[in-house]
Structures are given as C-alpha cells and as structure tokens.
C-alpha cells in the first residue's frame, strides 16, 4: 500500500485552505470515501502534505457505515459533528461522488477543478467551482 504514494501528488495550497478554515474556526472534516482503515487513510493524508491532526474528523471504514454518493453518508457526518447542513460546505473534486449527494443532504458545495473527476461529462456550471486559489477566495467569503 505504501508504494502507492509514488502516484499521489501534493498541492501546498491544500494545506493553506485547511489552515484558513481552521483559523476561521470551522471544523474541517476529511469526507473521503471510507474504503480504507484509519491507518491507510492517515497515510493518504500525509501523502497529501497534511497531518491527521489537521482534521476534526476523517471518515474510514471503521467509523462510518455509509459511503459516497449516499446522502446518508453526509447526514452521518453532520450528526457526528452536531452540525446543521446549511452551516456546512462540502468541497470535492468528483462530480458524481461529491456534489449531488452533498446537495441532497442540504450542504452547500464547491467543486474543486484541480484533478476534476467527471466520469459522465456532466454539466458543472451549476456548481460554484474553481482551482485552489478560487476555493481560498470562496472560503474567505463564505458564511
């Protein structure tokens, strides 16, 4: 598993966005599809240039019984945080896995176009979107 790190890149702007969210007092959850155990998810977090401690919580197959794109996945996260959907923002790069289900759960969304996954070539114009710089601006103005 650790050899997969060679295929994963880092974007220092990801750390900047996470830090800005934390500085603003937002809880930050890594809502990754929970197909790995915690030890593997923690490795993947580090491969991205972040630390598990950067997150309030992150999903793994040990701690959540739903996966994307089920809206119940997002509802479980909201319950775990004690948060209301209208107060939360889901940032994702996968049109199918991240955007629709999160919106169905009542969350606001931002489509990160860096490493965009759009398997079916869906129209993405309805979503607020952009690269990490645009995301930083969106986060700073969001509330």
Positions of predicted regions on the chain:
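Short, acidic loop-to-helix structural element flanking the phosphoryl-transfer center
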Residues: 1-29
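Asp-based, Mg2+/Mn2+-dependent phosphohydrolase catalytic module
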Residues: 15, 19-20, 31-36, 41-143
């Amino acid at each position: 598993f650790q050899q997969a790190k060679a295929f994963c890149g880092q974007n220092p702007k990801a750390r900047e966005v996470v830090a800005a969210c934390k500085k603003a007092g937002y809880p930050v959850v890594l809502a990754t599809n929970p197909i790995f155990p915690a030890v593997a998810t923690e490795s993947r977090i580090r491969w991205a240039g972040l630390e598990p401690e950067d997150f309030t919580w992150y999903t793994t197959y040990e701690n959540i019984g739903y996966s994307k794109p089920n809206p119940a996945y997002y509802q479980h996260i909201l319950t775990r945080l004690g948060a209301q959907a209208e107060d939360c923002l889901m940032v994702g790069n996968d049109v199918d896995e991240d955007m629709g289900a999160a919106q169905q759960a009542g969350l606001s969304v931002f489509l990160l176009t860096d490493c965009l996954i759009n398997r079916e070539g869906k129209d993405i114009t309805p979503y607020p979107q952009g690269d990490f710089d645009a995301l930083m601006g969106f986060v700073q103005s969001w509330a």
